[in-house]
Amino acid sequence: ALVSASGHHGSAGWGALADTALGIPDHHYREGSASLTLGSGFFRPDSRPSRDCSVLLARHQQRTVEGQLRWLDLMAGCGIRSLRWGLEAVQAKPERVELWVNDGDPDRLPCLENNLSDLPSPVRISSQAAEVLLAQAYLEGRFFDLIDLDAFGAPGALIQPVLQALRFDGMLLLASTDGRSPTGHDRAGAVRSLGAAARVHPASWELALRHQLGLLARQAWMLGRGLQPLLCFSEGRTFRVVVRMRRQLQPGEEHHLGLIARCEAC
């Protein structure tokens, strides 16, 4: 059920994990129902709460939406999120959920193929630049019901192509690790990446999330689409929002976008 970017079916299986030579660390890791090899790339165990939320939202969609589903892990790393989707979110009829797993680093492909080889759902693995994959999917008329974009830094440049590739009523899970700009510590950076300026504030984390929602909303409205916030949270290092894209704006939706002021005297 696994096809890599080269078109070859994966066959390594879990047995490959047992072939690691003694004395060579294989970075083996367990989380939820997943057991996998992390490889040599960047990985944050502390981000588990966001992966838990991703699994819960995917599972809810699989239970409540009829027909075929297509989920995209756009910057997959070692594939732990996709693996947990396949093991924990897909409860019945795994053939109705197609997993697209992408990482821009081609050196990640062997790790991804090995980690995802035993999933019962059809899996498509690639190592393309995110914007290239999204553009190709849009041109081919392939739309996704769920997209998880766990970006490094500010993801603003990818929001428009992500929304264009998202199916109506589909969910976008968006993460940003740019904590300076939206919390008022880099005003010029905030104007560049968010189209708004932020100030240092006692509620900086909340304002950062609101900036991110505002950016998403403006990009969706440019397409004539509506946006429904579902979930927002931050631990101060990463800012995560989950939204559902609607076919059209709801009455009064644009009135939710505004400015926040704070009196420094009192």
Task: Please provide the spans of the model-predicted regions.
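SAM-dependent transferase fold signal centered on methyltransferase-like domains
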Residues: 1-266
